[in-house]
Curated annotation (Swiss-Prot):
Keyword tRNA-binding: no
Protein name: Uncharacterized protein YqgC
Transmembrane feature ranges: 5-25, 28-48, 49-69, 89-109, 137-157
Gene behind the chain: yqgC
UniProt organism field: Bacillus subtilis (strain 168)
Pfam families membership: DUF456
Presence of the UniProt keyword Transmembrane in the record: yes
Topological relation to the membrane, as annotated: Multi-pass membrane protein
GO cellular component, one term: plasma membrane
Compartment(s): Cell membrane
InterPro entries with a match to the protein in the record: DUF456 (IPR007403)
Keywords, sorted A to Z: Cell membrane, Membrane, Transmembrane, Transmembrane helix
Amino acid sequence: MDMLYWLLIAAVFIIAFIGLVYPVIPSVVFIVAGFVLYGFLFSFSPYSYMFWLVEAVFAAVLFAADYVSNLLGVKRFGGSKAAIWGSTIGLLIGPFVIPVAGIILGPFIGAVCAELIVHQKDLKSAFKIGLGSLIGFLTGVIAKGIIQLLMIGYFLWTVL
């Protein structure tokens, strides 16, 4: 039965990793759900206040990494707040409009459209900013993936 429980916990963690590229899936919620699931299926006794504090810090860093990577990607390539908002909206809408490819194209198209509409930038500049948005998004995915691995690694270190 323990093996089945661990598979269930692993499945919840896998869903969290899917949330790296599909922003409608709240990664942190699924990671914490894995911790709580372990507590219900096995025991909450391994969890100390320090465990929850460390995991909360990881979660805060994860949220910050997402925001900062997008911000730096757009700003580095000359984008404005409008491009950041466009990128975020594109990230949320893109996967639904263009399944799979929308994950990558959404932030790019959103940033480009925002710069073209709000600041009347020329197409070349808007594309450059869109590229910055894409680089920021991909950097954020990598950073968040590493942080999620650290969260799960600390969980495993605590309970095993």
